[in-house]
Amino acid sequence: MTSSVSRPSGRRADALRKVALTRHYTKHAEGSVLVEFGDTKVLCTASVSERVPDFLRDRGQGWLTAEYGMLPRATHTRSDREAARGKQTGRTQEIQRLIGRALRAVFDLEALGPRTIHIDCDVIQADGGTRTASITGAFVAAHDAVSKLIAAGKITRSPITDHVAAISVGVYEGAPVLDLDYAEDSQCDTDMNVVMTGAGGFVEVQGTAEGVPFSRAEMNALLDLAQGGIAELVQLQKDVLGA
């Protein structure tokens, strides 16, 4: 799809922003990635602990969980830290649960063994698509953490069953577009976040009409756009991992 819609960035309707995945961005975490979707920048780390939550004790399997947050000046105006307010927002809780679900969809938790991978996604700069960037970058960080577990002899095979990535799509000025930045996201008629595996399976679809209902044909067009964009992101993951 190459609609002639005029986007603020000048991109085609089916074009991603410039995407970069920088591995080993910090030195302490077992996996760390700086993911950039245009001007959106998120630091994703994967940390391994040799224990599992109480509800999984003695079950012989592992767990993967995620936390998400934004630096106070990640947006146009400063926001108080949620720790200072003493409570996470509903948006934060929703996004971190989404990140955890997305990655668990491509993990064999029994093969991981009785340990937990903690994913932390910290938004350094926000310009739309922070949750989709977080999922895409967190997968690479988790992959690096798993590689260290294998190298240390703690597991004998990778528990990762497939790649997973995510992208936003929406209806902007009446046309379906891929990978919305903030200027588009704040003005779009429909906003959708799509999470898919490398094999093309859907993990999650979150879609909302912003006042104007969308048709089945528009939804199908958005999903087609998302599928193409996610295929590009999965290929980028493979390229940076050397897979």
Curated annotation (Swiss-Prot):
Record's function text: Phosphorolytic 3'-5' exoribonuclease that plays an important role in tRNA 3'-end maturation. Removes nucleotide residues following the 3'-CCA terminus of tRNAs; can also add nucleotides to the ends of RNA molecules by using nucleoside diphosphates as substrates, but this may not be physiologically important. Probably plays a role in initiation of 16S rRNA degradation (leading to ribosome degradation) during starvation.
**Per the database entry, which stretches of residues form a coiled coil?**
none
Q: InterPro entries of this UniProt entry?
A: ExoRNase_PH_dom1, ExoRNase_PH_dom2, ExoRNase_PH_dom2_sf, PNPase/RNase_PH_dom_sf, Ribosomal_Su5_D2-typ_SF, RNase_PH, RNase_PH_bac-type, RNase_PH_CS
**Which superkingdom?**
Bacteria
User: Which terms are listed as keywords in the entry?
Assistant: Nucleotidyltransferase, RNA-binding, rRNA processing, Transferase, tRNA processing, tRNA-binding
| Species, as recorded | Burkholderia lata (strain ATCC 17760 / DSM 23089 / LMG 22485 / NCIMB 9086 / R18194 / 383)
Q: Give the lineage.
A: Bacteria, Pseudomonadati, Pseudomonadota, Betaproteobacteria, Burkholderiales
Is rRNA processing given among the entry's keywords?
yes
Q: Which GO terms describe its molecular function?
A: 3'-5'-RNA exonuclease activity; tRNA binding; tRNA nucleotidyltransferase activity
Q: Show the catalytic activity.
A: tRNA(n+1) + phosphate = tRNA(n) + a ribonucleoside 5'-diphosphate
Q: How does it assemble?
A: Homohexameric ring arranged as a trimer of dimers.
Q: Any keyword RNA-binding?
A: yes
**CDD domains, per database record:** RNase_PH_bact
Q: Which GO terms describe its biological process?
A: rRNA catabolic process; rRNA processing; tRNA processing
Family membership noted in the UniProt record: Belongs to the RNase PH family.
Binding of phosphate, residues: R91, G129, T130, R131
Task: Please state the gene responsible for encoding this protein.
Answer: rph
EC number(s) per entry? 2.7.7.56
Could you say which enzyme class this protein belongs to? transferase
Quote the protein name from its UniProt record.
Ribonuclease PH
Q: Which cysteines are joined by disulfide bonds?
A: none
